[in-house]
Amino acid sequence: AQTGEEKYSLGAAFKLLVQNKYYLMIVVSYLLMQIYSATLNMGIYFMSYVLKNANLLGVFSWAINIPMIVGLLMTPMLVQKWGGMFRLNKMGYIIGSLGRILVVVAGYMGSVPLMLASTAIAALGMSPLQGNMNALIATCSEYTYLTTGKRVDGTMYSCTSFGTKVGGGIGTAVAGWLLALSGYVGGAEVQSAACMNMLHILYLWMPMVLTILITLILRGLNVEKAVVEQKEK
């Protein structure tokens, strides 16, 4: 086998990818992350009709972006301190899940300050996975090489990029479809009760559920340990 190059048919490359359970976990997580982002794009409707202040969208964007940037800057140091990505990512998403649960509680309370604080906590918790995703994919590729003797680095990155586009597209389409199904009327000052309930589902409940699902996946994504075990064989 030519270990320095990737010369496989589409079918052979696909087989190599699906044989790596850790890579499949990453792909599913990536898809869920993109759907998560799409549901947060419903924020403008939630701010306008539930919180009655469309200008809050910018404030909530800052509550996501600033903690995310801080977390990304800290990720390399935290990976080193925690002895790898597995524990850091898992604990980060546990924090993220707790944050999103609090966002749901705060949303029904109508407490904007608590919603903002909880949103920031969730974003901070999710940031390590965003920061080390490429390193995770590289580790997955190393695992495939150690178990099959074949390199699939480029194929893995390409499929992950494709997954990002698919996940974002699915999330946006589903969110838009559900909003329309609930009876949303563009430009109306007041929306129906069904539409208001759907806004709560899309902006509060769905992000929470998606975050919890990713957390469950991350519990098994210890590809670093698997690589070490393969090298010791």
Where are these regions (language model features)?
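Membrane-embedded alpha-helical bundles of multi-pass transporters/translocases
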Residues: 1-233
